[in-house]
Amino acid sequence: MADFKPLRVAVVGCGNISGAYGSSLKTKPDVVQIMGAFDVLTDQAKAFANNYGGRVYEKLENVMADPEVELVINLTSHHAHAEVSSMALIAGKHVHSEKPLSTKREDGKKLLELAEKNKVRLSCSPFTFLGESQQTVRKVIHDGVIG
């Protein structure tokens, strides 16, 4: 049986949700290794790296060029998801994006095509903002059943 090597990840976007990801990743050092973090607000990337490990990438391009990074976890603002994920896929990195995958349907299709073309995986967190539960609540309120 071959030795299992942890998946080497970089986090891009170190806002509020990054703490939940960092805490979870840190509990599985045999499965994932945090290589570093990037954020346009460098202090946020520094805080993430101090709390969860890895280096601070000064530029987004440095994350994409790092041959040690196998997976990019995209936690950027919604409007940046497609661009950041696209860069990572083109660089041959697997991508896990926080929801939504993209803000435009055509961008989402392009991401799927890039993942297939570059033989890498693309995943996205469950869509909860406008999920079934929220739609049911909205309908019940709209229909006057409650509220």
Across the structure, where does each feature detected by a protein language model lie?
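Beta-loop-alpha module in the N-terminal Rossmann-like domain of NAD(P)-dependent dehydrogenases
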Residues: 21, 54-114
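N-terminal Rossmann-like dinucleotide-binding module
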Residues: 1-52
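Short, Asp-centered acidic motifs that coordinate Mg2+ and/or phosphate
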Residues: 36, 70-71, 121
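Short, well-ordered coil/turn segments that N-cap beta-strands
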Residues: 32, 93, 120-121
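A contiguous active-site-proximal alpha/beta segment in oxidoreductase catalytic domains
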Residues: 102-147
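Acidic-histidine catalytic/liganding microenvironments
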Residues: 28-29, 66-67, 131
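Conserved G/P- and acidic residue-centered "switch" motifs that form tight phosphate/ATP-binding loops
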Residues: 13, 99, 144
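Short loop/turn motifs at secondary-structure junctions
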Residues: 31-34, 68, 145
